[in-house]
Design a protein with these regions (language model features):
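Flexible phosphate-sensing "switch/lid" loops adjacent to ATP/NTP-binding sites
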Residues: 1-15, 22, 27-152
Length: 152
C-alpha cells in the first residue's frame, strides 16, 4: 500500500470504479484516510446511489462536504437531486429565450427528458466537474471519487 500511496501523492483526482460489491467504497475510503493521515488534504466523494460511504466512515454524510478531521472531508452526491438541479438550470436558461406561452410545453419536455438514457450520468458528470473546480480552490490536494457501480 505504501508504494501505491507514494505513486498517488502527485495525482489530485482518483476515481475508484468497478462492478457492485467489489469493495470500491472500502477502497476509496481507505485511500482517502491514508492520504489524509500522511498530511494531505483530501475530499472523498461518493457518486454511488447506495450511499454506503457514510456507513464505511461511520459518519452521517450529505451532499455538502463535511470535515471529518483536519485533513479529511467527505460527501455523498444524490444522483436524483443532481438531475433535478441540472434540469432546473437548463429550464432557467431556456426560459430566458422562449416565449412565455411556450414554457408549459417546454417544461413537459424537460420533465420527460429527466428519465432519458444518460440524463443521470450527464448530471453527475457536471456535478463532479463542479466539485473538482470548487474543492481545488478550497485547497484540497486530492479528490477521491467512489463511483457508482458499472456493468449494470
Amino acid at each position: 500500500m505504501d508504494r501505491l500511496l507514494q505513486s498517488l501523492q502527485d495525482r489530485p483526482l482518483l476515481f475508484v470504479g468497478g462492478k457492485g460489491g467489489v469493495g470500491k467504497t472500502t477502497h476509496a475510503a481507505s485511500l482517502a484516510c491514508r492520504l489524509a493521515a500522511l498530511g494531505r488534504k483530501v475530499l472523498v466523494v461518493s457518486t454511488d446511489p447506495a450511499h454506503s460511504l457514510g456507513d464505511v466512515l461511520q459518519e452521517k454524510l450529505s451532499g455538502t462536504a463535511r470535515a471529518l478531521d483536519d485533513n479529511l472531508s467527505a460527501l455523498e452526491l444524490d444522483p436524483s437531486r443532481m438531475v433535478d438541479e441540472n434540469f432546473a438550470a437548463v429550464e432557467k436558461t431556456i426560459a430566458a429565450y422562449a416565449r412565455p406561452e411556450m414554457l408549459p410545453r417546454l417544461r413537459e419536455h424537460l420533465e420527460a427528458a429527466k428519465s432519458s438514457p444518460g440524463a443521470e450520468e450527464a448530471a453527475m458528470l457536471e456535478a463532479i466537474c463542479r466539485h473538482v473546480v470548487e474543492q481545488r480552490q478550497q485547497g484540497f490536494q486530492h479528490l477521491v471519487f467512489d463511483t457508482a457501480p458499472t456493468g449494470h
